[in-house]
Amino acid sequence: MRSYEIKRISPAVNKTSQKIGPKILVNPYYGCEHQCLFCPANDGFLKRKAFDDFREKGVIRVVENIIDHVDNYILNNDYAKVIHLSPVSDPFQPVEAELQLSRQIIKHAADINMPVAICTKGSVPGELYPLIQKHPHSFVQISILTINEAKRKMLVRGSGASVEELLNEIEAMSDYGIRIIARIDPIFPYITDDMAEFEALVDELKKRKVRYIVSSVADVIEGALDRERGYLEAIQPGLSEKYTNLYTEKINGRLHANTEYRENIFSKLKEICESKGLEFGITWEPDINGNSINHKYSHQISNML
């Protein structure tokens, strides 16, 4: 029995939508049952009532006419190259099994010969593998935070596949010929920044034919540290103070761990990955002035994201 309420919506299609570049960003679900620590879908960063309703009332809004919106974005964008599913809420959270909107989008993408870029902490049904594999530019990003299942449960506080399930899923998709990016992302300071555990996870991913690994360090919306103080203390006494002392750089409206910590982490992660013949990259990470530091750590993998 689900512990959330579904609210079905069919927002009007904006026929004059602005050009948005090569990525069509698609969120069929507003709200995410995974409830990951510091996730922008549920921490108030996105100033939309739909996301507030999930956090405050347990209501997931689902966009029933999502295919109409996808087609409209394609029509209004000359350079549309990929459907990104999803940039915020997980497309394969438990509600998907009931409503199957993500399945509809993937099937539609296959019908119109448009590649999809999927990002999930959940399980992608095997029935979709042929549709994903059909387009040579489609790929799947599996978010696997750590090899330590107990730590994963601390951070993915709602649903989400286990470490073993995610590794099995990666292996199955790799064997099917689907391009995979493993996202060890984000790194949570003092929780998942153990380099021995990171290396052990990289070894398991390499066994499953993963070639690309992406990472980042968690950033935090203002107020979230205070809201999560009790939870951080339950994980480790003194952890909330460590986070307060580490998250001192406010950049573009969010708090970031100081640049020295982040660069030290990325240098170590890159060294581990490259020593094993894997490509390493980071998602967008700014310095204190808001300038990207990605060029220091990313290779051609960045072009896939």
What kind of region is each of these model predictions?
Residues V95-E96, L128-P130, I191-M195, L225-R227, ...:
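A short acidic (Asp/Glu
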Residues M1-Q141, I147-M154, V163, L167-N168, ...:
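Conserved Radical SAM active-site core
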Residues G58-V62, A97, R157-E165, D193-A200, ...:
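Alpha-helix N-cap and loop-to-helix initiation/capping positions
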Residues P91-F92, A150-S159, D185-Y190, L255-H256:
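Surface-exposed cleft-lining segments at the edges of enzyme active sites
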Residues K81-I83, V116-I118, V140-I142, I180-I184, ...:
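Hydrophobic faces of well-ordered beta-strands that scaffold small-molecule active sites
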Residues M1-R8, N14, A196-L305:
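Auxiliary Fe-S-binding modules of radical SAM enzymes
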Residues G158-S159, M173-D194, V220:
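Conserved strand-turn element in the central/C-terminal portion of the radical SAM core barrel
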Residues V88-D90, K121-S123, S143-I147, D185-P189, ...:
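Active-site beta-loop-alpha junctions enriched in small/polar residues
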